[in-house]
Amino acid sequence: MATVLTNTGKANMINALNGGSHTAPQHVAWGTGAGTASESDTTLFTEASEDRVSGTKTVETTTVTNDTYQVVATITADGTKTITNAGLFDALTGGDLYVKGDFTGIALNASDSIQFTIKIVQDQA
């Protein structure tokens, strides 16, 4: 199991710091495919049929004041499926994948939901 800040996510954040155009990532999706998240990933493993959800974005404190960007979103299943990965995107469709995580499958029935909390923590280590 892994959770990664993707190479595209890193590049977009640096571009924003340099004055480039930037859309804050706040859209969450989930997938049903197998695999281990990698920094080079640009998509989920088999993105599921539900639409991406716009999450609530906030700035939080993990170690030092305001060092964490956080998005919280809840997705509801449209049918029976097992969710194995999730990601944070900068668009409701298409767009760039910033954060991706894979995990042990969570079996869902129609109308079941999962609340995801995705954090990007600035760390000098």
Q: Language-model segments: what does each one mean?
A:
Residues M1-T84, A91-A125:
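Small cysteine-rich, disulfide-bonded extracellular modules of the LU/uPAR three-finger superfamily
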